From Swiss-Prot:
Belongs to the DapA family. It comes from the Bacteria. Its EC number is 4.3.3.7. Pathway: Amino-acid biosynthesis; L-lysine biosynthesis via DAP pathway; (S)-tetrahydrodipicolinate from L-aspartate: step 3/4. Transmembrane segments: none annotated. The keyword Amino-acid biosynthesis applies. It is found in: Cytoplasm. This is 4-hydroxy-tetrahydrodipicolinate synthase. The gene is dapA. It comes from Acaryochloris marina (strain MBIC 11017). Homotetramer; dimer of dimers. InterPro entries: Aldolase_TIM (IPR013785), DapA (IPR005263), DapA-like (IPR002220), Schiff_base-form_aldolases_AS (IPR020625). Keywords: Amino-acid biosynthesis, Cytoplasm, Diaminopimelate biosynthesis, Lyase, Lysine biosynthesis, Schiff base.
Amino acid sequence: MTFFGQILTAMVTPFTDTGDMNFSVAEALAIHLADHGTDTLLLCGTTGESPTLTWQEEYELFQVVRKAVASKAKVMAGTGSNSTREAIEATQQAAKLGLDGALLVVPYYNKPPQEGLYEHFRAIAESVPDFPLMLYNIPGRTGQNLEADTVARLAEIGNIVAIKEASGNLDQVSQIRRLTPPEFSIYSGDDSLTLPYLSVGAAGVVSVASHLVGELLQKMVTAFASGEPQVATEIHLKLLPLCKALFATTNPIPVKAALQLQGWQVGSTRLPLPEAPDPIIQKLKNTLTDLALL
């Protein structure tokens, strides 16, 4: 078992009807997820709507969830930024608050070259030398790809222990696995690609679908690791319509709508992300019903 486990849930950030943080629902949801297949809770990532949260809101959420789940699950903070100084400050704060690690997204908008990316992540790692860090490559959102050779260099830094790979490029994931030591963990950043990534040496997934099917995802990853690929394939194909429905429009709009259909008062997304339109809600209803999740 890797440090962060097999199933990491990129948790939504619950809001009230007025758009304020809903810490009581966050607490209840975190406990529910920890009890239903989640090894590590990732807070304030893409799914957690980090672009529309203040750092103070994030720090308070870190504390609430850390206290709520106690030892039930690890808690990871999304502390990445396109400002290295800002990322260092946030990552140091997450470490001080007793979290188990941090997720660091590739700097967005300013599009640094590979050497700049290396220096950015190295500087953050050196600022928290005993704090486990996971890189996060999602070029579709950041505008820049973290190349396999750069990942390999970063994997030589002791506390950079994993990567969330959301490029959708199986060749690149294969190359990362080839160039990095076995103890460096690769996680799929896309639920629908988890099984293909496992086939080239990934450890698991940073998941959105695990809000709804965490235990099934655990079963899929465990089956593959235990030499039962057919069982893993059956689960993968069963869950594929759900994975697609959850990304029918910009994440996390669909997963918040799905949770609301299940009775979770997670609120809507903050602007500029709108509420889920009726066709998306109907698609989610049909998909959840087919899986007996409603």
